[in-house]
């Protein structure tokens, strides 16, 4: 019965960061650090603060997600890492070195260590897949033999060996993004910045690209910083996430923790599309008080991930007594933690509504009596 009721999503979770540090010992120290970072722009309406007092550390080898509403400062933040944006105040440290002190030559070398992929691919339409990937190496003066070896390796990594003579117009969106990823890796970077890299792709292609990014992170030990408005992308691939609002950090933590128990209103709003809303049909029938003796108590149970095991639904239903009906919901695993929500209707129990809620609290981290239905 439990298997039939419980919906579990196999999210192909990214390997635990602890596991990756065994393969890459250098992962146990902070790679990128923002210290009191601020960025302002002069606009027609006056000075606009894009970033305010950002203090944040990203561990080497981590897949780190950045989310927030439009204009929250996400792109401004990651563009300070390769110095495409000059901070107004504060510092950006990479491997404990303040990059604000770099001269032009050191900045060029830094930018080669930082790959970047974009929403709109930015491929050259008149060049083939091979030529698009090769171009940064050509510009850098890399000898032809080395260029060919590197391009061949990268096209194999992203699965485009058979498309090396194709032009961008002949590629799907996912294939174009794979070219973009290959091009971003030509200089063997140790940081990869992803700015809405999957937002122009369909769900199936998004999964494919995320799988590729996971593989790159695992094999190469890259630090990946990922901006997205798609919360499912954060859930799928990231180790930790930070939420920005008006240029400030309003929440951060492990993905399972933020998703399971969002504290800030912005986080709650952004996560709302992933939550199970109360069905309209149920809302129309819900009553504050029971209208008859055979009315069912409607309970909402939330699992926030503080315990790693999935709830034993058979034991839960038996403890509630009476006839228990699952109205909606499911439980999924994120980073090894069980998260989700169940809506239950309980009829014919010897327990009253408050007693049912307390009993359900032995299995769920949050329980609520929503009302009664007949």
From Swiss-Prot:
Belongs to the ABC transporter superfamily. Methionine importer (TC 3.A.1.24) family. Pfam families: ABC_tran, NIL. It is a peripheral membrane protein. Its EC number is 7.4.2.11. The complex is composed of two ATP-binding proteins (MetN), two transmembrane proteins (MetI) and a solute-binding protein (MetQ). Keywords: Amino-acid transport, ATP-binding, Cell inner membrane, Cell membrane, Membrane, Nucleotide-binding, Translocase, Transport. This is Methionine import ATP-binding protein MetN 2. Part of the ABC transporter complex MetNIQ involved in methionine import. Responsible for energy coupling to the transport system. It comes from the Bacteria. GO terms for molecular function: ABC-type D-methionine transporter activity; ATP binding; ATP hydrolysis activity. It is found in: Cell inner membrane. PANTHER family: AMINO ACID IMPORT ATP-BINDING PROTEIN, METHIONINE IMPORT ATP-BINDING PROTEIN METN. Residues 32-271 form the ABC transporter domain. It catalyses: L-methionine(out) + ATP + H2O = L-methionine(in) + ADP + phosphate + H(+); D-methionine(out) + ATP + H2O = D-methionine(in) + ADP + phosphate + H(+). Gene3D superfamilies: 3.30.70.260, P-loop containing nucleotide triphosphate hydrolases (3.40.50.300). It comes from Pseudomonas fluorescens (strain Pf0-1). ATP binds at residues 68-75.
